[in-house]
From Swiss-Prot:
This is Transcriptional regulator MraZ. Belongs to the MraZ family. One of its GO terms (biological process) is negative regulation of DNA-templated transcription initiation. One of its GO terms (molecular function) is transcription cis-regulatory region binding. PROSITE patterns: SPOVT_ABRB (PS51740).
Length: 168
């Protein structure tokens, strides 16, 4: 069974936009980086698409996605959209020796983290979603989660009932 990103972690973002990747996520990143042999592991941060967060993929998972995009007919609207939002609006990231990254300016813009918030200190939420993880501005994540749950699942309902609808 493949390694998976699981859990939810709030991490401080310092004035230089550095943030520590949660240790369990670092293990998955390392396992998903074919070139990793100790030292600094790499992953891909995608800031494209109409959403309030960035998504992060292991190198292996991103290779799978790129193969699927390559399989689409050249020049089609679907392929162009995916190329732009998953490839062009993406960055290769490398963990530093302390397991941190510097959130890139485009990523900070996507999350809505302002320079003033960096100076005063802010938090990011890391949310594991199996084959990828999301990075959110912490207060945006909390608000979005509450709103989403109200729409998808009635209060008191068993969340596993959502799997029954798919036959899984």
């Amino acid at each position: 069974m493949a390694e998976a990103f699981r859990g939810e972690y709030n991490q401080k973002v310092d004035a230089k936009a550095r943030v520590s990747i949660p240790a369990p996520f670092r293990r998955v990143i390392e396992a998903g980086d074919p070139k990793y042999s100790g030292g600094r592991a790499s992953f891909v941060l995608v800031y494209g698409g109409d959403r309030s967060y960035v998504e992060c993929y292991t190198m292996t998972e991103m290779d799978r996605i790129e193969e699927r995009i390559r399989a689409l007919p050249m020049g089609t609207p679907r392929r162009r959209y995916l190329e732009r939002n998953m490839i062009t609006l993406a960055l290769n990231m490398e963990l530093d020796e302390d397991g941190r990254i510097v959130l890139p300016p485009k990523g900070r813009e996507k999350l809505g983290i302002t320079p003033d918030e960096l100076k005063g200190g802010t938090e990011a939420t890391f949310a594991g979603t199996l084959n990828k993880f999301q990075i959110w501005k912490a207060d945006t994540y909390a608000a979005e989660l509450a709103a989403e749950e109200e729409v998808i699942l009635p209060p008191g309902a068993d969340m596993l009932s959502l799997l029954e609808e798919t036959g899984l």
